């Protein structure tokens, strides 16, 4: 049976365009002109995913999102003109349960949607597979062991030649919250960190600024030539590749170039460069996300002597990228999200 998608948007043009795009991909599409109509339709038949605008009459999209997540969580993809450059609204949507964001221009919407059809279908299909309970488990602290219990021994890590120099992290769907959990747990003197998170162009700058306010380490959008230093995390800019080179230390390289593994930025680009440049001094981490970007790169890191970690299925919103890495034999450890940070700290000791 085809997944059921509910498109909630007050624009008839957008509803028609999205219905055609998703319908051609074999998805069953229902539409609603605003959230109140959507709630009535959801009472009759629960959708597998919702594509949601933000600015609508009678009830705005964020209020509707909060209600959906509180009452009967359904995977939501935000597709809105407000989800553009520097948008606090898009960050709010992701923090309150949306699994992904598609930015929509205010002019030429129909043409943009048609040009972006492949990404829209990919994101919405991934949303239908998202496990929102996994997101809750990932954000919940691990239970404390009972009094008197023997502490669990730290995992035995592969021998490392040289010092702990660089942590590289890749994520896609569900990754914004996973990255927050990971980076908030890092101490001020954590090893240098480079991050690729699949998200729209320019949106990454605001995402990095938000993380910087929450974390003890510095978090910023990477610029070409930035130094990768202890206590700093660099986030790949949207629509640009991030790699690393050695020039009197580790340096970020931000570049154009064709998509790799269907993505720009690509996790594979970052991981392959880290394997070449830092090898055994690297820890590679592949978090929740759709597709297989990063799986080959994580395997190359492991072959180069790096320690490698994949997020487990129980805490992944979409168990795509980590699953592919595990299938390739790329992961030394498979861990729930709350234990990934402790693995970083154990490795860095």
Swiss-Prot record:
Q: Where in the cell is it found?
A: Cytoplasm
GO BP field: chemotaxis
Maturation and modification:
Phosphorylated by CheA. Phosphorylation of the N-terminal regulatory domain activates the methylesterase activity.
- Residue ranges occupied by any Response regulatory domain in the UniProt entry: 4-119
One family from Pfam that matches here is Response_reg
Q: What is its main location?
A: cytoplasm
Q: Does the keyword section mention Cytoplasm? A: yes
Q: Which parts of the sequence belong to the CheB-type methylesterase domain?
A: 159-349
What top-level class of enzyme does the UniProt entry assign? hydrolase
Query: Which keywords does UniProt give here?
Result: Chemotaxis, Cytoplasm, Hydrolase, Phosphoprotein
How does the record comment on the protein's domains? Contains a C-terminal catalytic domain, and an N-terminal region which modulates catalytic activity.
Q: Which family does it belong to?
A: Belongs to the CheB family.
Protein name (Swiss-Prot/TrEMBL)? Protein-glutamate methylesterase/protein-glutamine glutaminase 1
Query: What species does this protein belong to?
Result: Anaeromyxobacter dehalogenans (strain 2CP-C)
Which gene is annotated as encoding this protein in its UniProt record? cheB1
